[in-house]
């Protein structure tokens, strides 16, 4: 399912951004530790890297927004675009290739996924639950849990999802920053486990 994007046409090579320099030493050291843990889990497989979309100014979409029209939605800032490219660069530098890249239908999620990995597969279950009937949100959450359980049973393979803070909060019972990824897996009882976090500097 193709969804509109707010991104201008862009050569593929522009997505291969390298990680920014000039970070504080303490931040680098902390990031390196989580980096190593997440990489090992992704390489082993049986997990999902679920990212909150990259930086997009504002809190909620404007009244009357439409999914098919990016101009009516919150969109990525320039910093957010750089952040999304850095996510892709991190995976590319480590030769980590997701088996599947899925995205919420919202433009800021589609754009985050596109800048990082190329055009994603759009999945309604990853969409924001705000403004939707409670029954719809509950059904989507069941879909996500089922998909995570399936992904967790496939060693040597991982998926990447791009979604929203509220979705990740409902699914994993934790908060996330813009552009942050949670490495998730389901245990044998189907419970969702956060086994690592990944915050990649822009």
Name every feature range the model reports, one short phrase each:
Residues 40-42, 150-153:
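A short acidic-Thr-Gly-centered motif at the start of a beta-strand
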Residues 46-48, 157-163:
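Generic beta-sheet signal
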Residues 96, 151-156:
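Glycine-rich phosphate-binding loop signature in dinucleotide/nucleotide-binding domains
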Residues 93, 126-141, 145-151:
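All-alpha RGS (Regulator of G-protein Signaling) helical domain and cognate RGS-like helical scaffolds
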């Amino acid at each position: 399912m193709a969804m509109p994007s707010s991104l201008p046409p862009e050569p593929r090579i522009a997505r291969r951004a390298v990680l920014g320099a000039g970070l504080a030493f303490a931040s680098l050291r902390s990031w390196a530790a989580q980096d190593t843990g997440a990489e090992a889990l992704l390489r082993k497989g049986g997990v999902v890297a679920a990212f909150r979309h990259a930086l997009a100014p504002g809190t909620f979409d404007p009244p009357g927004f439409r999914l098919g029209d990016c101009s009516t939605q919150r969109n990525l800032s320039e910093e957010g675009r750089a952040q999304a490219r850095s996510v892709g660069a991190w995976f590319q530098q480590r030769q980590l290739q997701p088996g599947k890249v899925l995205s919420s239908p919202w433009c800021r999620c589609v754009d985050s996924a596109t800048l990082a990995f190329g055009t994603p597969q759009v999945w309604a279950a990853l969409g924001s639950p705000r403004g939707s009937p409670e029954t719809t949100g509950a059904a989507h959450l069941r879909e996500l849990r089922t998909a995570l359980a399936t992904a967790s049973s496939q060693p040597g393979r991982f998926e990447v999802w791009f979604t929203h803070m509220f979705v990740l909060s409902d699914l994993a019972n934790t908060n996330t920053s813009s552009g942050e990824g949670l490495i998730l897996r389901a245990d044998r009882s189907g419970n969702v486990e956060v086994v690592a976090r990944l915050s990649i500097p822009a």
